[in-house]
From Swiss-Prot:
Coiled coil spans: 48-120
Gene Ontology cellular-component annotations: CCAAT-binding factor complex; nucleoplasm; nucleus; plasma membrane; Sin3-type complex
Protein keywords: Chromatin regulator, Coiled coil, Growth regulation, Isopeptide bond, Metal-binding, Nucleus, Transcription, Transcription regulation, Ubl conjugation, Zinc, Zinc-finger
Protein name: Inhibitor of growth protein 2
Organism of derivation: Homo sapiens (Human)
Amino acid sequence: MLGQQQQQLYSSAALLTGERSRLLTCYVQDYLECVESLPHDMQRNVSVLRELDNKYQETLKEIDDVYEKYKKEDDLNQKKRLQQLLQRALINSQELGDEKIQIVTQMLELVENRARQMELHSQCFQDPAESERASDKAKMDSSQPERSSRRPRRQRTSESRDLCHMANGIEDCDDQPPKEKKSKSAKKKKRSKAKQEREASPVEFAIDPNEPTYCLCNQVSYGEMIGCDNEQCPIEWFHFSCVSLTYKPKGKWYCPKCRGDNEKTMDKSTEKTKKDRRSR
């Protein structure tokens, strides 16, 4: 009885091994066919693309020649005929450009289809345990809760201040309107104005009562904030709108409570108190 079971197991293993070998052989054959035929198909498309490009260059030269004749021609009838030639040449150049785009699209689809075909065939040899692990990982990734949008508690470290300055600097660069087109510049200005209005009148959020408060307004952190460079500042962080800032200033910056004559200098009395504490 035991011998029959062993023979059945051996037979099943042999069948599985034979089936796997057959699938592997088929995969290798299909792979070789795809790899061998792909260069020929690509070369044919490249040759067609080169021919279209030559015709396109000839058409552009024809357009230049006709346009030069048109500028020098004084006869109205002759100018009208040249206009028709110029129009036909422009239409021809557009058609050639469309054909070139179509050929390039065909080349891209050809490569993608071959790669997709090989990937589909390779799944036959994937380890079942590995497939199960990949499936479980995908389920875990999809079931993870979304990250909280609440700003983390700020700490009094130079590293956190630098990171805040870097983030504000990047956002400030995005807010500056580019000098390309008037329409884009107007849209940028509208978005920047709307952003400033949102910062001036923040929306009521579900606030944690234990969350720390900052700024002169004694509210929680939101939007863009800047840190006072006075290490002894009791408030430390300020909203841009509360201190009349639209972008992060260069160099050091002191809050209204710690500054001296201007926002770049510290109050002398505050600086003196700081030195006295160090001497103690």
